[in-house]
């Protein structure tokens, strides 16, 4: 089976979150199972781009509204990732250093989707599946069905749409509908949701199959989906919750070259002690105290706003018998709070504002506990990384966290779970961790 994954991220090419991890791993394992898996993504100015060799495989031109753009498709030559990787280069739109956060992101990802459809439409054969990931590629199921230029040749190609996070839907005002390729006008309702063009809603309507990244998240979307609750309920017949996995070759404490000492389950105690000592030394913490870490975006979705008070209370309540370490970036005000806490709780708390892939590996290997108090967690990969490295996950009982972590109080439990995204629930769980 030939499967074409279309996404905005793919690790290690360009990654902003869990989407990149999944798109970087899933095609590799599909290929190992005998399928032909490919990834198509935008060409950003990243280290991976400059460090590898590429060949030009296609050039073309298209329009978004009245604006013509030229695009080219380049392919990584050596199959370095274990699957065919293609980058779409659109000069002035996609070739930027960051993935997201530009004022013209609508035009950027719209042009990317149009270019992908235009390219695949010119293939001498049809792929077996187009697998679209999140709202950045969510208009493709509509385009292949109803865009006048594509539908005759592409409408019968099966499409799968995976919801990695329904909070971000890619809304486009109807005042910009002219940017879209010409389509059957009587199908405008397949784009619309609450009087706006909603790419995610369109994909849920138009894709042959819809998947979410955990079983529990699919159920939760019928109750809380940022306005799409009724749609997910209506389309439940073609929707499936499939739990994400992790790349066990990248995340392997026995071979990981980003940690201080490698180990397996027989040497886990010795290995973690060495990594904890290394980590504590970097951040001025005590390697003999329990280390509770948080790795993630500093946003409300992750309950990061609760961290300063929960950590402060826990340090006072337990007389400094635990250390805390935070890795992440996001809300500037929250970043400032955490920075101030480093001085207030010197020797008990520290943080690294930003993202560091090497540091995240060392934190999984050197921490005793990983805290994930998320308000929303479609799947969550961090708790799986933690378990892989022998670190106990402390998670809210929601989404993929519910599907992957059982509480120590249950039979065969191996984590700490709590029900509420609240300071009280977090501090109580921290107390349970310290008492172990």
Can you describe what each PLM-predicted range is?
Residues 1-436:
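Catalytic cores of nucleotide-sugar-dependent glycosyltransferases that transfer UDP/GDP/TDP-activated
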